[in-house]
Each structure stands twice: as C-alpha cells, then as structure tokens.
Amino acid sequence: MSRRRKICVVTGSRAEYGLLFWILKAIESVKDLELQLVVTGMHLSNEFGMTYRQIEADGFSIAHKVDMLLSCDSAAGVTKSTGIGMIGFADAYELLTPDIVLMLGDRFELLAAASAALFAGFPIAHIHGGEVTLGSMDETIRHVLTKMSHFHFVAAEEYRTRVMQLGEDPT
C-alpha cells in the first residue's frame, strides 16, 4: 500500500479561502491524499474577525496556525510580519513534511510561506499566477511566487502567456 500524499494548502484571507474551498473539499475526497491546512494572516486576526473559525465551522481541520501579523501595516511592519511568517512556516513545514505546498494569489503572507517551502525543498504549486494588479506590490509578489513555484495553475490563456514570459512552464 502506498502512503498518502500530503498536500499542504496555505490560506491567509477570507477572499482567497473562498476560492480554495472546493479545492480543499476535492483534496479531502481523495483517499490517497492528506489535506494539511495551514492558516495564517487575517484568519488569525481579531481585527479581521478571526475567520479561521469559519474554516473550522466548514468542517476543515487546521493542521497548523502561523500567527504572523503585526498591528502595523507600514512597510517596516509588513517586512517584520513576513519575517515572523517565515519562522512560523519553517516550523510548520518541519512538523508536517508536506509533499507539496499549494497557494493561491499574491499576498505577502504567501511570500513568507513560499520562501520557507523553497528553503526546505518542498515543491510549490501556485494558483492565479500571471495576472496583473497595476500599481500594487501584490503584482510583484505574484510574479515572485510564480518564479518560486514548480507547478502553475492559471485562469486564462493570457496569464499562461505571462507565466511563460517569466521563464516558467505552465503545463
């Protein structure tokens, strides 16, 4: 009997969790896969409603929580939060030893998650690479995540082309 493949999914906001919901359900429905859900960012913030509770109410087990948000959204605050996140994700991945880390989007929490996965040698799958958010730091983070990722799930041919322009193979 082969062992179950561990799929670590990172979620940091209610908006991106909504997009991940059916993917999480699909992973759980496959007997050869083990969902390892890691919550971080706004999900763990009083200011944003502690939305990890909704994830639990939806029936998902949370494998690990990475509390990384400081109460400051200045450049220094975001930078420090990212550093705290890298430490937390390093601990999470050491404990969980995933076969792959799946993430969606372009938020700075994912930069911490991807950096820790990259250093630990865990492959990264990124959903929604190649998209554009003009005038936003999120676009740069999305492109960095695309470069760090081993597997790419894009939403349109235009985004597939952009992923290829970044030197990646979106197949």
Each language-model region and where it sits:
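Active-site-proximal region of nucleotide-activated glycan assembly enzymes
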Residues: F122-T171
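Structural motif
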Residues: K6, D99-I100
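An aromatic- and histidine-rich active-site surface loop
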Residues: L102-F119
